[in-house]
Amino acid sequence: ESLTRDHMHVYGYKRETTPFQTEANIDPHYTFFNHVYSCYTQTVQVLTCALTEKNQYNGMNLSDAYSIIDLAREAGFKTTWISNQSRFGIWDTPIGAIGSECDDQYWLNQYVGTDVITKDYDTALIPYLRKVDPANRRQLIVIHLMGSHISYWDRYPGEFYHWPVDTSKERETAEVMNDEYDNSVLFNDYVMESIMNEATNYLHADAVMYFSDHGEEVTARPGHNADQFNFTMVHIPFWIYMSEDYHRINPKTAAMIEARRNVPFSNDMLYDTLMGIMGLTAVHYDSACNLFSPDFDKDVTTLMTMYGNVMIRNDREQVGENKEEIDRLWNRKRME
């Protein structure tokens, strides 16, 4: 939630905000993707695409779109939804409707209203993974974090107050916001480490996919308002963990996942991409929107964000004139 890769050390940010993910980046079980964008700057608009057939490229109405939960259940998967976000808040109800399709649901946040509020840190979600039966190998588990959503200082416990290092200096508002956001990113990294410990040691997950809904502009007046759009609001992390078993059983898909680490992509196509990873390619699936399919037909000239109103090729710092140099630096860093 609200995590821009521009504040993640694993993606080149100056502060070490992601010690776990920085280490995971050199683990061959993980693949980090370098040029991934959100399709919008707000949660509902993003996740109603990322988790359903609807995307920027097919023009489908949400009311006509199947969700990944629909198709997983039809294919015999046990589905579980674990969330620290509100189920019925004004900003959350469409996502709550998707989560409510799951066989098992754990909604920690009972708040109903117009604010984004929770009484729990995201680590409160971790014990609910122990309610999942690891013996059932045909499962889809969705975890929805509160992440780095405003107010940043409410997203992490005191022991993760790492910045500023020198608390005696007076700070401008922009510096305070930057420090608080980075502390939330550091805590989020710890949450991901905790989730992955459960996923690998208890659930023995075949694969884990992690992405942010959208990014954040961190200034004196931070946020992700579409009316003040800039690209840092849609710069998001995306990575996949694959177990040894997944590599062995799905060698072609695993090889394609690793080969596509530097291919630009937008997260409204995660539905088709996840369908491909799960082997659900019979119906309600478009291989042209699956990043790991040979049929994937999007590139930097056609990729969009903001529901088709902004072309990703205009983000020249990331994928324009400097794309090849960025890729070289990224690959060199991985080998260090």
Regions found by a protein language model. Give the residues of each.
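Active-site-proximal alpha/beta segments of enzymes that process anionic O-linked groups
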Residues: 2-168, 267, 272-297
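Histidine-centered active-site microenvironments of extracellular/periplasmic hydrolases
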Residues: 12-17, 200, 204-205, 209-251, ...
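A long, amphipathic alpha-helix that forms part
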Residues: 126-131, 166-208, 240-242, 261, ...
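Active-site rim elements
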Residues: 55-59, 113-116, 175-189, 196-197, ...
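Conserved beta-strand->loop/alpha-helix structural units within folded catalytic cores of enzymes
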Residues: 2, 75, 195-196, 206-214
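Membrane-proximal envelope and lipid/glycan-remodeling enzymes
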Residues: 31-55, 207, 216-230, 237, ...
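Membrane-interface soluble catalytic domains
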Residues: 70, 87, 197-202, 226-229, ...
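Flexible internal linker/loop segments at domain or repeat junctions
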Residues: 158-176, 246-255
